[in-house]
């Protein structure tokens, strides 16, 4: 009986945590989705962004009390501009998706929305974490040894 309870708790924690990618696994996945060089942005920059925004966690969320928005998923895409969570006042939903779609282990929708974000004039500078931790820095460490 104790084994079943422990197993249940372990499975529940995995479900709540979502998928946390290994660094090279994510690098290969993002490359397969066409992010390497997309809009002139290197794969290493995308990896740096994902590291600092979510620590490679698909279920990461962050509430922003100022505008009552929430950042979602591996790229921490914001509900004020890019997705619909049904709670953010004045939301634009430029990616035309539910914010919950950004929390899936399958990051297809998250990648598609990230591509939409960088098509705007700000490009990758839309992400504060990228500006703080990746811009004008050697980001090669994020793909080093991954064979991508």
From Swiss-Prot:
UniProt keyword annotation of Membrane present: no
Residue span(s) of domain C-type lysozyme: 19-148
InterPro entries attached to this UniProt entry: Glyco_hydro_22, Glyco_hydro_22_CS, Glyco_hydro_22_lys, Lysozyme-like_dom_sf
Residues of the active site: 53, 71
Keyword annotations from UniProtKB, A to Z: Antimicrobial, Bacteriolytic enzyme, Disulfide bond, Glycosidase, Hydrolase, Signal
SMART domains hit by this protein: LYZ1
Gene Ontology MF term list: lysozyme activity
The reaction(s) this protein catalyses: Hydrolysis of (1->4)-beta-linkages between N-acetylmuramic acid and N-acetyl-D-glucosamine residues in a peptidoglycan and between N-acetyl-D-glucosamine residues in chitodextrins
EC number: 3.2.1.17
PROSITE patterns associated with the record: GLYCOSYL_HYDROL_F22_1, GLYCOSYL_HYDROL_F22_2
Highest taxon in the source lineage: Eukaryota
Signal peptide: 1-18
Cysteine pairs bridged by disulfides in the record: 24-146, 48-134, 83-99, 95-113
Enzyme class: hydrolase
Single GO BP term: defense response to Gram-positive bacterium
Role, per record: Lysozymes have primarily a bacteriolytic function; those in tissues and body fluids are associated with the monocyte-macrophage system and enhance the activity of immunoagents.
Family: Belongs to the glycosyl hydrolase 22 family.
Record note on quaternary structure: Monomer.
Miscellaneous remark of the record: Lysozyme C is capable of both hydrolysis and transglycosylation; it also shows a slight esterase activity. It acts rapidly on both peptide-substituted and unsubstituted peptidoglycan, and slowly on chitin oligosaccharides.
Name assigned to this protein: Lysozyme C
């Amino acid at each position: 009986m104790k084994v079943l309870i422990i197993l249940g708790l372990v499975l529940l924690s995995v479900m709540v945590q979502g998928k946390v990618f290994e660094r090279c696994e994510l690098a290969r996945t993002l490359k397969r989705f066409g992010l390497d060089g997309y809009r002139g942005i290197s794969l290493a920059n995308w990896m740096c962004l994902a590291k600092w925004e979510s620590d490679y966690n698909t279920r990461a969320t962050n509430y922003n009390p100022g505008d009552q928005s929430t950042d979602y998923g591996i790229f921490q895409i914001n509900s004020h501009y890019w997705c619909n969570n049904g709670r953010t006042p004045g939301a634009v939903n430029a990616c035309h998706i539910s914010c919950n779609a950004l929390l899936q282990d399958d990051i297809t929708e998250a990648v598609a929305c990230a591509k939409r974000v960088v098509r705007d004039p700000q490009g990758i500078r839309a992400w504060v974490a990228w500006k703080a931790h990746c811009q004008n820095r050697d980001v090669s460490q994020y793909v080093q040894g991954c064979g991508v």
